Amino acid sequence: MNKPAVSRIANILKNSKNFFLATTDGKRPYVRPFNAVVEYDDKVYFYTNNRTHAFKQIETNPFVELCAMIGEGYDRWLRVSGKVEYDYREEVKKAMLDANPELRSMYSEDDKIFYVFYLSNMSATIHSTQTEPEEIC
């Protein structure tokens, strides 16, 4: 994926108060708020821990979707979908923790429950109630 697209997606997610991750257990969809993201190695990274329902659902079905509102209004949003790929490198965990220092009260780089991931085969589109969808990647 090209760097401008990655940076644009990361910036939209960083600037949204929260964004939402959708998973499924094979029968039902589940959505929960997320709020930590980091751009690293030309990828957008997120985190979870291996004690959550989200982690278990991702293990069953690694295809997820994210959604974030853009700006202050309610007429634009970003949808991102792809396949979760875990990255076990400590430097990626460090980048996540450095970009989101509030996580340091819960996790460390060598923490065995802290999982950092990116989306492979990522597609991202900005939707609006006023205009046609804009494909980012």
Regions found by a protein language model. Give the residues of each.
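Charged, amphipathic alpha-helical segments
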Residues: 4-7, 48-54, 101-102
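A short, Trp-centered hydrophobic/proline-enriched beta-strand micro-motif
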Residues: 11-26, 64-68
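A generic structural signal for short beta-strands and their flanking turns/coil linkers
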Residues: 15-17, 40-42, 60-64, 74-82, ...
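N-terminal leader/targeting helix
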Residues: 18-46
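Short glycine/serine/proline-enriched coil/turn segments at secondary-structure junctions
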Residues: 28, 74-76, 127
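A short mixed-secondary-structure module that forms the rim of ligand-binding clefts
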Residues: 37-73
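Charged, gly/pro-rich active-site loop segments
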Residues: 78-137
